Amino acid sequence: MTTRFDAITLEVLWTRIISVTDEAAKAIVRTSFSTLSNEANDFACVLTDARGYALAQNSGSIPSFIGTLPATVRHFLREFGEDGLKPGDVLITNDPWQGTGHMSDVSLVKPIFHRERLVAFSATTSHMPDIGGRVRAIEARELFEEGIHIPLSRIIRDGQRDETLIRLIRANVRTPDQTMGDIWAQVSANELMENRVRRLMEEYHLYSLEGLADELFGRSERAMREAIAAVPDGTYRYGFQTDGFEKSYTFKIALTIKGDEIVADFTGTSPAQPRAINCVYAYTYAMTAYAVRCALLPGLPNNEGMYRPVKVEAPEGCLLNPRFPAAVVSRAQTGHYVPVLVLGALHKVIPDKVMAGAGSPLWAVAQTGTRDDGRPYTNVLFFNGGMGATSGKDGEHVLSWPSNISSTPVEVAERNSPLFFHYKRLRAGSGGAGRHRGGLGQDILVESGSTRPIVLSFMAERTKFPAPGFKGGGAGGLGDVRINGRKVDHRRQHVLARGDRVLVSTPGGGGYGPARARAAALRLRDRLLGYIGGKGG
């Protein structure tokens, strides 16, 4: 028998479910050991129904995880079967093809039982401070170089920890206390979601969540289909080149809208590479659906129904759908271009609903070394470029898109590693010119204060091909990495000695509309605030 929900009750229940994931997210921030979770926001909490379909994701989360985490739940369901799951089980994996796309993210899933019946799953994923292997080396040529690979497994069985698996993980990472501390923080968040869901079901006398889920999914799907149907039918194409390694890479999309469905076809994209920038299909799909949602229905909370009208085709063996065991640790360097492709195609038909190219993909510096007491450490610092401008607004400065990851505060970064920050400031002139200017990137100058070598691995893009402007807008400024004033190859690892200085300059966002149409008052404001200088602006 299907339970019917009136509009008010449905809104109350949906809001309650979202609040459950938000509370779990706060628990991770408060209890995790590494800055990747408690400062950089590189984690997510998701609730699914018993079928593995997403009910809600915590607010302000990483957008890709709403597409990947529910798929991970369904992989566990296929592996163990509903009958093979028990109360007290906690499942774990970091398999890129069955998880979030790279092994740095560890996903935990807990089946939720109510009155001895499987009713839901709580799922979390978090970027580990270390997972072994090479230090986030973009030079890796296959998965086996990138760390310990945890297949679909149980870390807790019927309430009992698997001490063998725990010892195996600890033995293969540089920071075992931090890594396991973050995993236990996830376990706590999973258990919190379980308790809150069971309390909710008792309060509203719910025997199952499927009726509620189907009602939410149906309403969200109808809303998305209506938004798609409002866009004229047709196939809209877009493409560009990216930095690459020895040569640049090509990205292409053919976005077909027919009625109330949308199909993104990435045929023509460069083949998978023997480098760690390949992006698995699940991540490609998630980023595609996210971009469609941003353009067409940005205000509706995430759930399974929103994504049902969105289809993705990516040829097997291309950069956006690599075969195992392709190297994938820096998959964001590829996957973050997907939303730009989608919005680039859509700007030809709904220009007022999209933004120009952003200074993304996300930039990061992974560092590893040894403390004075001999203990190894690892640390990852994220940096952001400028956002693209839109038809009605300048791009935001130094904002993470599409990843939604926060930059680690300087004080925290200096506390956790022997780096000293000389400055962190906006890059004048890095925003693309236009009727609306692209957002500015930033300059970050750091110095090594360590008496021991520090190994750096960079994750950087748009050092050769800038963020594109739309409708006559100018391109954003290029990014750059320099050590002691000399431009370096950011694709290679570099070793810092005491006193060495690193200047990281992130790219700016593209402009929108011709620069000659920019209002005089805005030009004056740009000059007064120091936003103009060099190229762009």
Regions found by a protein language model. Name each.
Residues 1-87, 92-114, 118-263, 267-537:
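Glycine/proline-enriched, intrinsically flexible loops and inter-domain linkers
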